[in-house]
Amino acid sequence: MVSLSSLGRRHSSVIQMTLVALFVSATKLAGVLVTVTVAANAFSYNRFRKKFLHPFRSPIDESSDILAAFNVNPTTDGENEFFFGLATAPAHVEDRLNDAWLQFAEESPCDKSESPEHLQPADALMGSATADGGSQQASLSNKEGNRTVKKKKPLKIAMEAMVRGFEKYIEEEEPAPNDECHHNVAAWHNVPNPEERLRFWSDPDTELKLAKDTGVRVFRMGIDWTRIMPVEPINGLKEAVNYAALERYQRIINRVHLYGMKVMLTLFHHSLPPWAGEYGGWKLEKTVDYFLDFTRLVFDRVSDMVDYWVTFNEPHVFVTLTYCAGAWPGGNPDMLEVATSALPTGVFKQAMHWIAIAHSKAYDYIHAQSSASSNPIVGVAHHVSFMRPYGLFDVAAVTVANSLTLFPLVDSISDKLDFIGINYYGQEVICGAGLKLVETDEYSESGRGVYPDGLYRMLLQFHERYKHLNVPFIITENGVSDETDLIRRPYLLEHLLAVYAAMIKGVPVLGYMFWTISDNWEWADGYGPKFGLVAVDRANNLARIPRPSYHLFSKVVTTGKITRQERTRAWNELYRAAREKKSRSFYRAVNKHGLMYAGGLDEPIQRPYVERDWRFGHYEMEGLQDPLSCLLRFLLRPFSIKRKVKHQTDDAELVLQPLELSLE
């Protein structure tokens, strides 16, 4: 007869064996899942690499003394003329403008007296094509004393991450009162006369003369919607329109022509009237009707003076930063809107839909009201950046971001375009829910990776997709924030070489607009990043000081040529600074994991110049940089084909750091 104790031991043994079997099975299943996940991501990356990262042979003849020759002075009627231009925007340059940006900048989160339990966490941020930045967490009220409270603080992340609806919070100890206050707009409250911007409204001639003296043939400017319609036209346009302001714009546009330049006019450039922001702006259909009223007013007044029309500048950037992140004025999304922003029914696609409708209606009106002889040229300025994954598991994030931002807008309005405007500033390396700062890459002051090859790749991609439309491209914005001017000069030349190479490959590009003339207010980054060919002394009556890049740009514009000598000289100066371990300003905070915060800084940190060859056609992709990929690359290195890259130069001083290229 079996004892109860024996039965108990046997039962216990069976349970243990069962648990062990379950554990082993679970471990195997986990191993299979991990293997499948890694394999799937590796397969996805391999496809991505072949499609977007494949090496290409530059069509530029680098042995020639003349590397590029744009046809700025056609000798026969059949030749296509290439134009150069300079670009700016009302919110960047106009004084006496009580727009949403001024109100946003003047708001002081430090003045709010809220108890900790009522404090709302600031929205996470996204980097933007032209300039990154936005709101920060407000400090606690004074009545909290000096005690420390524990609260949630937003971990600011990148635009492409926020498009996908991510928001992260970290728990941390934070001193309650009297801390440094972070404003909605960085580097704004700590500079002289920030509200004056560049006084383009009261004194347009200073900027116009600087532009004219470079030799450019096109001047891109905008008309501010808020200035024309300071109040919502609920009771009709008569009581809502500032006709005197409209007349003033007409005189400014006439001044552009008197300086011998054509006009490219932008109707919406990241500045929504405050009254529209109060009711929801581009989330609602009635904004389409209001925008069409604005378009009619502008067109009816200045149509005979405008050569190119840009209805919208970078609409997906505006929608993302305003309605998905709340980092720009006029959005104020709640947590549900943020979390669902990238869904098919989310606020991103909702707002983009109404903007596409608004563009189409404006396009139809401009063409319908134009005479047959005037033949208006209407398009959009579409922001593109070259995105690549940092690690093996970031390919999906890049794919999703591209699917939302790269082609959908142009697809939706493709039959209502006379040209496709491309705004390109650089590359972005996606890591999880943020942008990774790659130590071996060069960056602008505002955190944009310098990558001229990306412009070439983007132009070829867009041409392949839209060549059936038979519409040309215009580079409506390209530039770099660089106060030292050492990066800007090679940046300018290399991106123009990228454009020229694309034209050799058959991409029809009509012109190139550089951003921008003088250092100005860069959205939520304030006056931190310096994008101008001309420096501005804000403490000395906004005195202008042309940088060396101003004269280089002028030379390229007037001759239409890029020479090997000019290229070598620009690179010598940059690499001398890199070899001497010099540093320059950087207006983007970076956390311990190397992720860039999207918010700007009131005062810059210092970052060294990077000794890397990013000339057009010379940049070498280093492969994935996450620990797993680096380990695999290290293990496979003995079996890889390696070659040392030697860089030829006419100047013995220019010695570039060789990179190893591993075939993966």
Report each predicted region and the residues it spans.
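Leucine-biased recognition of intrinsically disordered, low-complexity hydrophobic segments
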Residues: 4-7, 29, 33, 140, ...
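Short, low-complexity, Lys/Arg-enriched N-terminal segments of secretory-pathway carbohydrate enzymes
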Residues: 1-19
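Non-catalytic scaffold segments within catalytic domains of secreted glycoside hydrolases
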Residues: 41-217, 228-663
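Terminal signal-anchor or tail-anchor transmembrane helices
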Residues: 16-47, 635
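Short hydrophobic transmembrane-like helices used for membrane targeting/insertion
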Residues: 2, 14-15, 24, 32, ...
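Accessory DNA-binding and partner-docking regions appended to nucleic-acid-acting proteins
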Residues: 221
